[in-house]
């Protein structure tokens, strides 16, 4: 069970609330934010990274590559961003 304790140390259990709020205030100072919007932003980011990983893995499998390369991730990012626009 040593593996599980080392993995738990690397994974953050909470969203970086202060960092997200500070970054949003720097970029958009007049934007009014609700109380827990930082959690929604963090969740959205995690979902994007998960979709990116899945899509890049399928791109790597289609090109018969055992390793996910930079090109696979860039192609996956284009597809995911195009889907998210609507």
From Swiss-Prot:
A molecular-function term among this protein's GO annotations: protein heterodimerization activity
Compartments it resides in: Nucleus; Chromosome, Centromere; Chromosome, Centromere, Kinetochore; Nucleus matrix
GO biological process assignments: cell division; chromosome organization; chromosome segregation; kinetochore assembly; mitotic cell cycle
GO (cellular component) term, any one: nucleoplasm
Alphabetical keyword list: Cell cycle, Cell division, Centromere, Chromosome, DNA-binding, Kinetochore, Mitosis, Nucleus, Tumor suppressor
Listed InterPro entries: CENP-W, CENP-W/WIP1, Histone-fold
A matching Pfam family: CENP-W
Gene3D superfamilies the UniProt entry points to: Histone, subunit A
Protein biosynthesis is among the record's keywords: no
UniProt subunit comment: Heterodimer with CENPT; this dimer coassembles with CENPS-CENPX heterodimers at centromeres to form the tetrameric CENP-T-W-S-X complex, which is a subcomplex of the large constitutive centromere-associated network (CCAN, also known as the interphase centromere complex or ICEN). Interacts with NPM1.
PANTHER family reported in the protein's UniProt record: CENTROMERE PROTEIN W
Function: Component of the CENPA-NAC (nucleosome-associated) complex, a complex that plays a central role in assembly of kinetochore proteins, mitotic progression and chromosome segregation. The CENPA-NAC complex recruits the CENPA-CAD (nucleosome distal) complex and may be involved in incorporation of newly synthesized CENPA into centromeres. Part of a nucleosome-associated complex that binds specifically to histone H3-containing nucleosomes at the centromere, as opposed to nucleosomes containing CENPA.
Family statement drawn from the similarity comment of this UniProt entry: Belongs to the CENP-W/WIP1 family.
Name of the protein in its database record: Centromere protein W
Organism: Rattus norvegicus (Rat)
Name of the encoding gene: Cenpw
